Amino acid sequence: MSAKRRLFTSESVTEGHPDKICDQISDAILDAILEKDPNARVACETSVTTGLVLVSGEITTSTYVDIPRIVRDTVREIGYTRAKFGFDADTCAVLTAIDEQSPDIAMGVDQALEAREGQMTDEEIEAIGAGDQGLMFGFACNETEELMPLPISLAHRLSRRLAEVRKTDVLPYLRPDGKTQVTIEYDENGKPVRVDTIVISTQHHPEIEHDQIERDMKEHVIKPIVPAELLDENTKYFINPTGRFVIGGPQGDAGLTGRKIIVDTYGGYARHGGGAFSGKDPTKVDRSAAYAARYVAKNIVAAGLADKCEVQLAYAIGVARPVSISIDTFGTGKVSEDVLIEVVRNNFDLRPAGIIKMLDLRRPIYKQTAAYGHFGRTDVDLPWERTDKAAVLKEQALALAKNE
């Protein structure tokens, strides 16, 4: 590898990974509540360990949902259906410890600071204040069709394929827990040129030989997913590198909601504000503003205004308008970043209520995001992945740039 070339690595995990079990349970509960009560406030955290699921958090709603049933259905759907897997949907204990949202927080969210101070018009009074302070990032680049970095894109597709060959009995000896990792080599212009390394760790039946797992992973998982032109004789493969992965899932490791925030986003390729997504209703800007930031970044790249774009939004609790909007195109912008910020302000309502309305977020759409990434998904229709603003952004940005 020449001195100017570089390697970058991202990882993904399957739906049976302990932390991802928790994300899916939290979002399944959120979806069940939003289906009946779109205005509910939900902050739902899940923890799993051997034989036990604990659901806790703050939920304020007018409806009732059967949390233990949702937990068991989710665990069953993932594939933990037998005690010998170390975790069983029908026999695991389910504990719940649910509170209501703090009235101090609710006060800030229910009526935004600007409205309390009388600074907003009547129609703006409906704007919801941010549920917390914080900063969120959104990112897009033209490395893949879905405008995502290639390492995380391939890692997610490999993880999803692992679950697919297990559930369709192509490889019936696989069990639900698993991880993937992909290292991409970039040339001196920052373009991806080849896959340097692929790591796959998958839980399996104790009687299966390591050599068979290695052969099957290459034939049934890697080959259908990774484009042949990216693989060469120097690509390295590490399949179950410890030699054995029988004990897995919650029996192997405890899991928690919100522990896979880099897997959920851009695989470390872009910055992260630190807030997790799963189990949070859309008044939580950790979630909704991160989705909005991706929506903005993706439309900028789709418009051809930059090859790579990172958007940062920041909020104060109880205040509707973002305290800052920042855009970085890493030297790839076709117009200045000041122009981009202006057209973004003109075309995207980035107040929490504006985001919820723009992306229609008060719907039960979240469980499907809780495994295999929240961004760049081609298998599900997510509103923040649409590029419906690209044309107007391009037109306005180029017009503004002429007047600079």
UniProtKB/Swiss-Prot annotation:
Q: Which reaction does it catalyse?
A: L-methionine + ATP + H2O = S-adenosyl-L-methionine + phosphate + diphosphate
Superkingdom per UniProt: Bacteria
Task: Name the residues that bind K(+).
Answer: E45
Task: Name the segments for region: Flexible loop.
Answer: 101-111
Q: State where L-methionine binds.
A: E58, Q101, D253, K284
Q: What PROSITE patterns does the record point to? A: ADOMET_SYNTHASE_1, ADOMET_SYNTHASE_2
Where does the chain bind ATP? H17, D177, G178, K179, R244, F245, D253, R259, K260, A276, K280
> Quaternary state and partners of this protein?
Homotetramer; dimer of dimers.
Q: Spell out the family assignment given in the record's similarity comment.
A: Belongs to the AdoMet synthase family.
- Function, as annotated: Catalyzes the formation of S-adenosylmethionine (AdoMet) from methionine and ATP. The overall synthetic reaction is composed of two sequential steps, AdoMet formation and the subsequent tripolyphosphate hydrolysis which occurs prior to release of AdoMet from the enzyme.
Protein's name in the database: S-adenosylmethionine synthase
Species of the source: Geobacillus thermodenitrificans (strain NG80-2)
Phylogenetic placement of the source organism: Bacteria, Bacillati, Bacillota, Bacilli, Bacillales
Instruction: Report the gene name.
Output: metK
